[in-house]
Amino acid sequence: MSSSDESGSSSSESEKKVKKTPVKKPKKEPKVSKKGKKEGKKTKKKPKDENAPRRYLSPFIFFSKDHRSVIKNSHPNCSFGEIGSLLGQEWAKISAEDKKKYEKLAAEDKKRWELEKKNYDEKLKTQSQAESSSDSSDESD
């Protein structure tokens, strides 16, 4: 029996040593969307201009800034996401009159953004015109 035990154990050992190679699946051709772009390929995002004006804030964001610390103190063990959820619940509960305060702040911030954006766009336009005029003067030399 000892000889059969040895042969039985050696066969199980040899099975353990054999590595199974993973089956490679053939690569799928990328799907082409209606616009002719290949799906799955990421397009490169152009970098944000650091001089561009910051976008205006919504009424809820102004509300969140005011109430986040209060909720965080009353729920110290909550995660950032849970606090955000609680803020959303509080925002839904407050009256329309209370929301008007934050809507007014948001409207003022939007006016600020529109003015800054207008100035920023004009600045970009003058820069591009200056560059194009300097390019044309270089060609005439």
UniProtKB/Swiss-Prot annotation:
Keywords: Chromosome, DNA damage, DNA repair, DNA-binding, Nucleus, Transcription, Transcription regulation. GO terms for biological process: chromatin organization; DNA repair. One of its GO terms (molecular function) is DNA binding. Residues 1-12 have a biased composition (Low complexity). Pfam families: HMG_box. It is found in: Nucleus; Chromosome. The keyword Ribonucleoprotein does not apply. Residues 17-46 have a biased composition (Basic residues). Residues 1-56, 117-141 are annotated as: Disordered. It comes from the Eukaryota. InterPro entries: HMG_box_dom, HMG_box_dom_sf, HMGB. The keyword Nucleus applies. PROSITE patterns: HMG_BOX_2. Probably associates with the stable spt16-ssrp1 heterodimer to form the FACT complex. DNA-binding protein that induces severe bending of DNA. Required for DNA-binding by the FACT complex, a general chromatin factor that acts to reorganize nucleosomes. The FACT complex is involved in multiple processes that require DNA as a template such as mRNA elongation, DNA replication and DNA repair. This is Non-histone chromosomal protein 6 homolog. It comes from Dictyostelium discoideum.
